């Protein structure tokens, strides 16, 4: 019998709300039963916990240092781009400052690079031997991240060009319009055997990609629109990623039941992608308002999924 092409919408909405649902509210004393040992190693109480979706409010370096070695299957990181130092962009036809917050202020080339070295090193320790990390960034930061990965002995697997079809124009008219971000995918150890769900990436019924053709391997240029209006219902993070992007990342490199961590979780799009596909999620951020936004987004997701099951 020929292999049946998997439907993308089914992949996104594949939850059954039953007693085994990982989004079911757990007692604080029973956090993430499969990962109880991991969470018990963290001294502070979670900012929020619902089933296998857990958030912490703290500096990621402090939290990562408390996690057990070789305990995380996959990490997605969207670290500060350090753009908030006088730059401008175009928004709705107007020139606006790109200052995202004090957390995005540059401390100079050396200090910024030292930061990337520190957090990637901390992530390397907690990844499982065959674990992988994805890092998203623009040209302002991604090259420093790439060098930091190599210094910390990761093995780079791919660099993905996330092409944005509706990118903002360049106001100065002196440069090419920046219409993509780069995502680096790397393995913890050069000799490891990382997870890659090749068949799903090749044969899944994904939205049409830039230069993608049927029955060919998925390529490293992904055409995905920035977050849709409905993804910003409760507000947005200034570097919020679209759910379609994180769904692809999560489904490409993890299996059901795997533990995914986001050290700069923001509005927790990574966590929502995990919740939709039965992965366990740990998110870390320093900003209360973005953790609260994450909680509202998760609760809305649960509400929508319950409504769909009643139809």
Predicted regions and their residues:
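Core catalytic lobe of class I
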Residues: 1-34, 40-293
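Short, conserved SAM-binding/catalytic segment
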Residues: 41-50, 295-311
